Amino acid sequence: MRTLKLSVWIVAGLAALVSCKMKGDSAQSQRNMDLAVSENVSASAPAPMVEAKEGMAGPGGGGGKGGEKPADDKATWKRSQIVPNSSRVMVGDREELALRSMQTRVTIDGFRARVVIDYLYANDRDRQLEGTFQLRLPEDASPYYFAFGETSYEASTVKPTKPMLIAVSDGDLANDPREIAQQRKAAWQAPKEARMVPREKAAFAYGQTVRRRVDPGIVEWAGAGVFSARVFPLAPRKLHRIVVGYDVDLTRIGKDLEYRLDLPEQATAAVVDVSVTDPRATISPSVAGTQAGSRRRFHFEDPKDHTITVRLANPGAPLLVGADEKIGSFFATRVAPELPSSAAPGSDSAVFLVDTSLSSNPDRFNIWLKLLAAILDQNRASLRHINVLFFSVDAHWWKPGFVDNTPANVAELLAFAGTLALEGATDLGAALREATHPAWQQTPSRHDLFLLSDGAATWGESDLHAIGHLLDGAGSLFAYQTGLAGTDTATLVHLTRDSGGAMFAVAGESEIAAAATAHRARPWRLVGVEVTGGSDVLVAGNPTALYPGQSMLVVGRGTLAAGAALVLTVEQDGKRQVVKTPLGAPVASALAPRAYGQIATAHLEELEAATEGEARAYATHFRVTGRTCSLLMLESEADYERFGIRPDADDYVVKATPAAALFAKVLAQTLATLGDPKAAFLALLGRLERNPDIKIQIPASYRTAIAQMPDAAFQVPSAPLATRLRARSELGRDLAPQLARHDLSYDAITAEAAARRAQASPADALKALSSLVEENPGDAVLARDVGFSAMDLGLHAQAFHLFRRVADARPHEPQTYRAMAQALAQLGKVDLALAYYEIPLMGQWDPRFGELRKIVELDYLHFLRGLTSGNAPSSVRDYARARLDGLAAQIGMGRADLVVTITWNTDNTDVDLHVTEPSGEECFYSHRNTRSGGTLTQDVTQGYGPEMYVLREAPKGRYDIRAHYYASDANRASARTKVYATVFENWGTKQEKVTEKVVTLETGKESHPIATVER
């Protein structure tokens, strides 16, 4: 049941991060696990997470004696295949530059660390390149700094020399944006520092600047823990320095806090400096530290373990305080309040959702199976009836109904799970829709849900509020946070909060046993949060309830003195209780203001369009990269001015608008519309209207038509793919190792997709391709690529959601709206298709898109003819008739014997449409009008197309239609270009025939056949 309550939403919070100490797996559990994971062994290294306490019922339970001694290795997960801080610079989809060295500086204050990393990459090619810098961050890390520049060193340099390294004096680990570049003045040439810019404007400015062959870069949020930065130019035969700065919270283990730095193994040289304020800090591997004032510094060169950990013994509730010179004072604290624990009644039936996507391969899947076995074994009396839904882009049930939770059934389940392939993207929304309303269930029932997934929804619905609505009327959802990189904690928190469930932290095997029963504890309703001496108090995650053992990140404004306390008001059975937790001694830290800014931005972003302006102001001021803003660097100040990127009144907005009060006020006004698809579409139109780079004008008649459309017209549910191939044994021989290494070859994946299309089904083919999206979330080129393939496979709902993600990130590219309209038309969603067809016709788009308007008008006219003459239900048929009459008169072409359109998926690419007529005359970019009346639209040499050929009266004979591939982005080494072609015969008549085709263009091959038409 949805449990959002305004009185609780006024505060914020972190859904239950509960951690428990394992008292020992049963022999049966171990035997079950042996069946499932014997072939899924991962690399090793500890990965601790959060607090564990002994003797607490439910979510607070377990744990040893806290800070008296460090936990052993069994308290943490092994080192994952997906290593935090790992990076690469891709030039195309197959080639990457070599990482020569990596220098890392870590500053730890209380529960938080600031990390600055210098990467040195070599372009050993003889030509300039554009690269995509991909960085995998630790869980919940928040980047705030990005810079890029060429060095004077040759690419052949292997070991960094002293001038290439950044000198670090005792205690001087510069991490403020104003200091980082200054400290590196001698280390690079003409470096560029990124600025915070609204995300849509950053994408537009970047694309425009690349076309001028100058030096931009953009850092974008691309999914959980994944940031993508396009860098240009990468000079030939030179080393290039990329600097990244981010903040991350330490992990609580027992009563201790731990920071863990994972180093990628591909770095040929690594230097690490760590500075800590806590005198009790211990470090592993052990090295001698040096004292510098109140801080202790540790230095490493080429550490063999590739993992460095810092343990703070029993720090209590660390309190960071700091000032922003333009705004005022801020504080941040991490607290685990003591709450009484008691058992709660629950459903005796449960559905487990187990993520089998590529991101689970292999490390997470092993964890999910261990958790699954423990929960089933230790809750046999309470969870009597179970079923399991395994999901990625597809979803399939273990059994066609609930089965008894018996040891024999659990053993069978785990044996079956061990046979599954781990591939594909993650369609979380489709899985939740199926889990809450199983196809095999005749009579709806209320059952609890256990989500064993990283929560990163890389496929299908991406609106978190819309996904949350799928839980309306369902039982509680419980999720588990492993601490592994790539976890979308915000999604897990949101879903558990909305369903009345909880998220439990499971740092390692030692915490599984208690976490397995944590859901049985009774939650406390959160009524209020105060901090003595503080104001504008926010709690990360916006919980409606607290569980015993809860770890809360609390931030706010004000100057806190010694003796400050967190004061919670909680309620159970109508009885209120005040819980007071003393905070630690204040630690002066520059990290406190940004900790506040990060949580405040997350609050405001959650309310979407209603607080979009304030969210951007907060994100810009506190340098919070994510859903609202990107880091963008351009060549000069003039370039920033050219795109209207200038300092706004962000400081004033942040100072004058406390986030907590604004959040509470706007939430009360907008709660009913969050997740509503019609409201989301109207918000899209509002953003387009406010975008100065588009200059869109929305007619009143269109607004009226949108208002007439029912809410259902805007819903585009995407059912899980109905695949046939699910077993690991059914994978291509060479594919399984690639998936396990997360080292995907585009050619291998596309070959696998072609084989599956022939041998199994289109859905199986698309599942193979979706692994590219899972591995590269946020990559618009890949999303378009796979979207075109989905259209070609006849899977139009999947294509629509891929194109929608591209449009969200690149709203200034009009061809995407046309693609969305085409997909919707194929789905029979005619009202929404009409709405999207109109968008390219309402804006003033960049000239590089050629005669886009003419092509969309012809396409739209074809659609309107079908809508007005067909039987598809529409709420705006009168509007469609009026638009049909107006467009037909405007175009002045009632019919045509042959119409051909092409569009493609890569920017800065010159693809030309060539049509050879029966006479032998060829219509192409330099001969656009033929003697028989054939015409071609203007040549598009920079964008994504489209181009169109029209012949009204076609002489009899053969028409050869081809795409000529003259130029791709010269700065990329090997990205693919795909053409989506539509061929109309007898356009505008009852004999009209439509052929759609996707053609992959091969580098080095100029001419590619599309179709042959006989008249």
Annotated model-derived regions:
Residues 387-416, 439, 459-465, 489-493:
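Short beta-strand-loop
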Residues 453-499, 504-506, 511-518, 585:
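VWA/integrin I-like adhesion module and closely mimicked acidic/polar interface patches used
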Residues 345-404, 409-453, 481-488:
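Von Willebrand factor
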Residues 874-1015:
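Intrinsic-disorder/low-complexity signal
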Residues 145-222, 226, 230-353, 479, ...:
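An acidic, Ser/Thr-enriched
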Residues 20-110:
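N-terminal, polar/Ser/Thr-rich
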